[in-house]
Regions:
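Hydrophobic/aromatic ligand-binding patch that stacks against planar heteroaromatic rings
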Residues: 27, 75, 94
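Donor nucleotide-activated moiety binding/catalytic core segment of transferases
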Residues: 50-90
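Short hydrophobic beta-strand element within catalytic cores of glycosyltransferases
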Residues: 84, 101-104
């Protein structure tokens, strides 16, 4: 679970943070997997403290505890399911680059700019992400395949080609 925080028009209440952690924990228990956490500069310290109280975080990357942004590529590699709060296109992009379909988590209160919502819609249209509300995390199932590496690679190549074409003009 990659956690951001309030930003770009996404706002999380204290109860939503608690529900997010509890529902993610339930999801992991149902699937008999170990929860791993990655926090960011915007993740409230209280949320990180709650995670440390409830879970073994020896494999997690916790920003406030480590006082730095740790590397987490290895966690994306070993993760069976990648959940990311939807408040950061950078975090979503990093997760998608793993080649695994990403579950983007959103709060009830969103007032993001239209341009940002278009990014989310594009990722959804490319089937890189599946959106999920906080209250439905524990019930989440993928409607389609989870290995999207070929689609991610193809999208990357198309983007590179379009950049080269623009530079020629």
């Amino acid at each position: 679970l990659i956690l951001g925080g309030d930003g770009i028009g996404y706002f999380y209440s204290k109860s939503e943070w608690l529900d997010l952690i509890n529902n993610f924990s339930s999801f992991c228990k149902l699937r008999q997997t170990n929860p791993l956490f990655i926090t960011s500069t915007r993740t409230p310290i209280e949320v990180e403290e709650l995670i440390k109280e409830k879970f073994d975080v020896s494999m997690s990357v916790l920003y406030h505890s480590e006082k730095a942004r740790g590397k987490f590529d290895h966690l994306l590699y070993v993760a069976d399911n990648i959940f990311v709060t939807e408040d950061s296109s950078t975090m979503l992009s990093e997760a998608v680059s793993s080649g695994k379909k990403v579950i983007s988590i959103f709060p009830q209160n969103i007032n993001a700019p239209e341009k940002y919502l278009q990014i989310i819609t594009k990722y959804q249209g490319l089937e890189f992400i599946e959106r999920c509300s906080i209250e439905n995390i524990d019930k989440f199932t993928f409607p389609r395949e989870t290995n999207i590496q070929d689609r991610v690679d193809s999208s990357r190549k198309n983007f590179q080609r379009s950049l080269v074409e623009r530079l020629k003009d």
